[in-house]
Amino acid sequence: PLLERREAWDEIVTRYKEMMLVKYSKELKDKQLMDLFCDAISMVREKKILPSMRALQFAGAAIERNESRIYNCCYMPVDSIYSFSEAMFLLLGGTGVGYSVQFHHIDKLPEIRKPLKERKFLVSDSIEGWADAIKALIKSYMGYSSTKPRFDFSDIRPKGARLITAGGKAPGPEPLKVCLFHIETILERKKDGEKLTSLECHDILCHIANAVLAGGIRRAAMIALFSFDDEDMLSCKAGAWYELNEQRGRANNSVVINRRRIKKGEFESLWNKIKLNRSGEPGLFFTNDKDWGTNPCAEIALRPFQFCNLCEINGSDIVDMDDFVERVKYATVLGTMQAGFTDFHYLRPIWQKTTEKDALLGIGITGIASNKINPYDLTNAHKVIEEINTLIANKLNIKTAARTTCVKPSGTTSCVLGTSSGIHAWHSKYYLRTMRIGKNEALYHYLNAEHPYMIEDDVFRPESQAIIKFPITIPKGSITREESAIEFLDRVRLFNEFWIKPGHRTGENTHNISATITVKDDEWDAVCNWIWTNRDSANGLSILPYDGGTYVQAPFQDLT
């Protein structure tokens, strides 16, 4: 801010490096570890690998104060009153939240007990303060308190004030006021002795995400996992849902399917509903354990109350196998070092215990469609992952990773690296890439004044959000989505076989390849049969009509 510009790439990488030097000041006196770390940082500068994008965003004071901010995403069941306040805390810190509103989870929530009195509650001007406001309201309606909070927002800094620790601008108190109003409305509709439904829990979390989105830290990424027979959740994005319940746009929804118990007729019935919906909703989440979940993009297999730990390999410009193995080696170095960040606060102790238990890695590859990587050559790299992870973990006195390899959608990383996204083909030879931006941000005002053709209002929140449209031309020789859906799915299956499964050590589910399938009108039956036959080769899948269906302001749009 003092220089009135944004950080340069080298400055961002240096900030990340300095954070690690502080965190591991004793451990990095080991020459072997320091040499590996410095070589890994050099690879980040060259954009051959990337650490966690949240680590790059918040490296320094923000992560030093709250180590959960180093992690992109997490997962929890909604089975406690603390689920709601923890969601606010995590989302405000930039961490995406996967959550389960399956019947057996929400049934553990207390019955509604409406408060009879009020008392003043001063909301602190901090992430913890906003989360505490959610906690106080939920507690007052669930028998933990006999008084309802009368919120005083006078301590919250005004809209537009600079945020020192994490960067960005303060949203002011209004988004929190609106959020609390909507949550109280849901709670007030209930009668004493009733419990929240899955859809009501989901809506509460989506209203929380709306407040976070207005804060401009990061788009509040969420995925809701719901029971197979939950018709309310299945249909909550049907029709013109965005007119009356625009908050539901804050989360992707996926139906939980036990791959060992589902019958073909049940799956085909669900498939027909997805086909008719034409919106990419709901997605499919195949699992071996109904309590396990995933992150919003579904590439990481997570126990309840566990964080993702991501890093990335740029697969678009790999020269040969030796080059690939070097990138794998140094991505493993950084990922293992990131796994040591477990000094959490505000969250329940179970978060630290579970995250330390598996010390997960999520080593992904992006730009796969830019380089036509041969998956048969990937298996040798897993020996390097295991050796380096064990070496670094022993030096840091943490556990070795239970699961190590994934392919994430790589929305941000692919933009940084100039590659295709994860496993996906490029959208087309020429297309628009869209992203959301707050209207209070300096970049919005600049583009709106100088390049207004790049800007349009966000249909969900036109008063505060906008869409930026970037025209993209892809590299020659790249795979585009003109390939058939089955060709794409076969690539998913091969990378699952040769990249994901060899990286699995323990756990009910393996990691996953985050995949959105675009289906042409004549491909629906073939895709249905492929998924059914290969349901052991995927955890999370999203299905979208080739023409975009009813997806409003989709992230990729054709240009002619």
Q: What does each model-identified segment do?
A:
Residues P1-T560:
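Extended catalytic cores of very large enzyme megasubunits
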